Amino acid sequence: MATIRDVAKMANVSTATVSRILNADKTYKVTNETRERVWQAVKTLNYVRNQVKESVNKVDIKNSTVSKVKIGCILCVTREKYTDPYFMSILSGVEAKLIENGYSLSVIRTINELQDPTILFNTLSESLTGLIVMETLSDEIYSQLKDKVEFIVGIDTKHQDIDNVCYDQFAAAEKAVQHLIDKGHRRIGFIGGTDGIDPIRKEQRYRGYLSVLEDNNIKEDFDIVKNCEWDSKMCYSKTIEILNVQDRPTAIFAASDLMAMIAVNAIYEQGLKVPDDIAVIGLSNIDMSKYSNPPLSTIDVPKTQMGEIAAEILITLIKGERSLPKKIILPTSLVVRNST
């Protein structure tokens, strides 16, 4: 196994320099070139701290050494990690099921945080037994985590080699758009985001939206399709763009409730009314959606249940009770309120 000396030798620096860079010592002045050489050496040598780590094997688990098990979770959020109601509902399900079985979450990270090499290095050095990943990671980060963490369960991920718990995003979008068409709308805008890997045209919620349009002989118009990258400010500005097109849509499908509520706010600020001028439907049925003005029509996603099932699968894997990956798809349902 690689040591800090090996890293220093490959990067052509001292072990003290390596240590300070790994610890993000801001008082230590070092060039970006040196910093990059050190991180490249860390990656090449697959170096982590605490190489002599406490082993937690299946026998230990069966002998009730639950306290030795370290479980982590990675959230796909662009804001502060504890402010996104969708992911917090999933996380509450994860934590409840872990606590019920005597476990707890030791590490919670966001995808954005893992872009920082120091945070990624520290996470890889945590000696995690299991990990729950919410949505798809980049190939590079995912491969590094897979190399260090034996048991990984995904929630709404595209990683095919691990267990996945999800809802059918395509079908959920179809339900939302079909509801708008049933209400008489023919010109329907789309506000969504991507995983940062695939373009919007490959995103399942967009494909579900487009499928219903095609089934109803409605032509796709990319002028009223906006990729907001799950960013609230961008969502607001993109909604304004939709409202300013010459042939303004009579309805908008937003791929999350938060984006739908931002769209409603933008519509009001343009002097228009919901749903009289423009109907809006979201997706996820977060708690606050019923209290928006007007209450938001949406697609209910079993968020807490997804978290509970993912945690239950992870516990089963840690205990060595099964090995082949499986995919569990949970049902969604239309919730009609006053925004449509």
Predicted feature residues:
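N-terminal helix-turn-helix DNA-binding module of bacterial transcription factors
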Residues: 1-62
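Short acidic/polar active-site loop segments enriched in Thr and Asp
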Residues: 14, 48, 69, 129, ...
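Alpha-helical recognition/docking segments in bacterial nutrient-uptake
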Residues: 61-178, 182, 242-244
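Hinge/beta->alpha junction and helix N-cap segments in small-molecule ligand-binding domains
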Residues: 77-89, 107-115, 165-175, 191-238, ...
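Periplasmic-binding protein-like
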Residues: 125-134, 189-192, 225, 246-259, ...
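Short acidic capping loops at alpha-helix termini that bridge into adjacent secondary structure
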Residues: 186-187, 220-223, 274-277
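Flexible loop/turn connectors
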Residues: 238-340
